[in-house]
A protein has these predicted regions:
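Cytosolic catalytic domains that perform sulfur/thiol-centered chemistry
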Residues: 1-74, 78-79, 85-105, 109-201
Length: 201
């Protein structure tokens, strides 16, 4: 998993509420176990016509937003069914962080476990970010995970919360299994020092 400490990127706003996982990635992709290429299916019904041609009026198809790594999304993002593929599709497209006023809990957990940073902001900040994008699509935003803050173009900082363990994993680029593997020597030392507490089959 790629570490996330601090990065600066342009943003893209999709100010729609209740974007569910089926809209993020259609169910037909759920049989896929390889993450490669899932970015092409991101928001498929919104991005493409029936013949596969891109819809020019959809925001992600605009030439001036290509390469954006930060998505600004409406409230209750990632609701609906539990599908890890939704996170994989967002990452496959190139997003490293999604900012919203609220994330569905299962999506939020899937994002953190896979290295996609979900950032919760208040309503005022959300509208401010959407306005920045509307005024200038080339606006850049810095995500400073180490200090848990967003840095706007003119230097304004906005703090955001994150679970301490999730932050540790993201900053160090390790998933939960990787964290446990790194702690194996300490676990073995504890078990050796406290044999009566170790239950064996």
């Amino acid at each position: 998993m790629e570490p996330i400490k601090s990065f600066t990127s342009t943003i893209v706003a999709l100010p729609l509420e209740n974007i569910d996982t089926d809209q993020i990635i259609p169910a037909k992709y759920l049989k896929v176990t390889d993450k490669t290429g899932l970015g092409e299916g991101l928001f498929q019904s919104w991005r493409y016509n029936a013949d596969g041609s891109p819809k020019p009026d959809f925001v992600l198809n605009r030439p001036d937003v290509q390469g954006a790594q930060i998505l600004i999304a409406g409230n209750n993002f990632g609701c609906g069914s539990s599908r890890e593929h939704a996170v994989w599709a967002l990452q496959g497209y190139g997003f490293k962080a999604v900012i919203s006023t609220y994330f569905a809990s299962i999506f939020n957990n899937n994002a953190l476990k896979n290295g996609l940073l979900p950032i919760v902001v208040d309503q005022e900040t959300y509208y401010q970010l959407v306005s920045l994008f509307d005024e200038d699509p080339e606006t850049t935003l810095t995500v400073d995970l180490v200090n848990q803050q967003l840095i706007l173009p003119e230097g304004q900082t906005i703090a955001f919360p994150i679970d301490p363990f999730a932050k540790h994993c993201l900053v160090n680029g390790v998933d939960q299994l990787g964290f446990l593997a790194a702690e194996e020597p300490a676990i073995e030392a504890y078990e050796s020092a406290h044999p009566a507490r170790v239950q064996t089959v």
